[in-house]
C-alpha cells in the first residue's frame, strides 16, 4: 500500500499531477515576482505625508501578499489517492458509525438510514445520536436495527453529541455523518485501508450535494474540494469536513474528543490532531450526497 509515505514515483496519477505542479509553480513564481515589484513600488510611492493612513494601507497590502503566498504554496502541488482506496490486510476492524440528528425532517433522515443499512462492510455498527429526541427517529432506528441514543441535555450542540457517541461506543475507528448525507455503500471499505499507516488520524472524503443544474450559487464548494484539500493532502494536512469523515479513536482521544468551544469542531479537531503528530488524508471521490440551498 502506498498512501504517500513511499517514493513520489509510485503515487496515484503521479505524472499528471507533476505536470500540473510544474505549471502551477511557474505561475506562482511569476505572481511572486509581480507582487514583489508591486510592494516595492508601493513603499516608494505611498503618500507618507499622512503616515498613519499610509502605514495602514501598506499593512493591508502586505497581509494580502502573505495570503497569496500561502495560498500559492498550498495549491501548487496536489496529491490524490486511487478511487478504490486501499484494501485492509487481514481481518477488517470494527467501525462505529455516528449519525448526528437534530430535528431534521423524517423524509431527510430516512434515505440516510436506508443507505446505512446497505453499507458493504462486514463489521460496522450504527448509532443514531438524536439531539432532537424525536420519537419517529427512534422508531426508524429500531426499524433498521440501529442503536439509538438521545441525551438528556444538549450541551455543546453537535460537538457534545459526537462526544456522547464516543463515550457510549468503543470501536477503534469512527465514521461521522450528518443526517442528510446519504452514504455510498463502499464508504467504509474505501476509507479504512488508509489507517494501516499508524500516524493517520483522519480520512476526509469529498462531499457532493443535490444541486440545481449548473450550480448557479456555487454550493459545490469546488475551491475547497478541488484545490484546497488536494493541496493540503500533499503536506499530509488535509482537514475534516465534518461529515463522511473517518477518525481513529485513539487520535480523537489524544486531543480530548471533539472541541466543544467552536462551531467548526471539524476544522479545529483537525488542527489539534496535527499538533499531536497525527496526519490527515483527503479522499477526493464522492462517498456521500447531501442537500444544499436551492436559492
Regions found by a protein language model. Name each.
Residues 113-123:
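Short, acidic, metal-binding catalytic loop of nucleotide-sugar glycosyltransferases
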Residues 263-269:
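Acidic donor-binding loop at a coil-to-helix junction in glycosyltransferase catalytic cores
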Residues 93-96, 125, 268:
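Cell-envelope/extracellular polymer assembly enzymes that use nucleotide-activated donors
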Residues 1-91, 141:
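N-terminal membrane-anchoring/stem segments of glycan-assembly enzymes
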Residues 96-104, 119, 194:
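A conserved hydrophobic helix/loop-capping motif in glycosyltransferases and polysaccharide synthases
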Residues 150, 154-173, 184-263, 274-275, ...:
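Long helical/loop segments within the catalytic core of UDP-sugar-dependent glycosyltransferases
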Residues 122, 130-137, 153-154:
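A conserved acidic beta->alpha catalytic loop
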Amino acid at each position: 500500500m502506498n498512501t504517500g509515505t513511499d517514493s513520489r514515483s509510485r503515487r496515484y496519477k503521479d505524472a499528471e499531477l507533476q505536470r500540473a505542479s510544474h505549471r502551477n509553480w511557474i505561475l506562482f513564481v511569476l505572481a511572486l515576482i509581480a507582487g514583489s515589484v508591486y510592494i516595492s513600488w508601493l513603499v516608494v510611492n505611498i503618500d507618507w505625508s499622512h503616515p498613519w493612513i499610509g502605514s495602514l494601507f501598506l499593512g493591508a497590502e502586505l497581509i494580502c501578499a502573505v495570503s497569496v503566498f500561502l495560498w500559492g504554496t498550498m495549491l501548487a502541488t496536489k496529491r490524490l489517492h486511487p478511487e478504490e482506496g486501499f484494501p485492509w490486510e487481514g481481518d477488517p476492524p470494527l467501525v462505529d458509525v455516528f449519525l448526528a440528528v437534530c430535528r431534521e425532517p423524517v423524509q431527510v433522515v430516512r434515505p440516510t438510514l436506508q443507505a446505512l443499512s446497505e453499507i458493504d462492510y462486514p463489521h460496522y455498527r450504527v448509532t443514531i445520536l438524536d439531539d432532537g429526541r424525536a420519537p419517529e427517529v427512534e422508531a426508524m432506528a429500531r426499524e433498521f436495527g440501529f442503536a439509538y441514543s438521545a441525551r438528556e441535555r444538549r450541551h455543546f450542540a453537535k460537538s457534545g453529541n459526537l462526544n456522547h457517541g464516543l463515550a457510549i461506543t468503543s470501536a477503534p475507528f469512527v465514521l461521522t455523518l450528518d443526517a442528510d448525507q446519504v452514504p455510498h455503500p463502499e464508504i467504509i471499505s474505501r476509507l479504512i485501508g488508509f489507517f494501516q499507516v499508524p500516524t493517520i488520524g483522519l480520512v476526509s472524503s469529498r462531499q457532493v450535494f443535490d444541486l440545481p443544474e449548473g450550480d448557479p450559487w456555487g454550493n459545490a464548494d469546488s475551491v475547497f474540494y478541488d484545490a484546497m484539500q488536494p493541496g493540503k493532502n500533499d503536506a499530509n494536512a488535509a482537514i475534516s469536513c465534518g461529515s463522511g469523515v473517518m477518525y481513529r479513536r485513539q487520535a480523537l482521544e489524544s486531543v480530548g474528543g471533539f472541541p466543544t468551544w467552536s462551531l467548526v469542531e471539524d476544522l479545529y479537531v483537525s488542527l489539534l490532531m496535527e499538533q499531536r503528530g497525527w496526519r490527515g488524508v483527503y479522499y477526493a471521490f464522492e462517498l456521500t450526497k447531501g442537500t444544499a440551498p436551492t436559492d
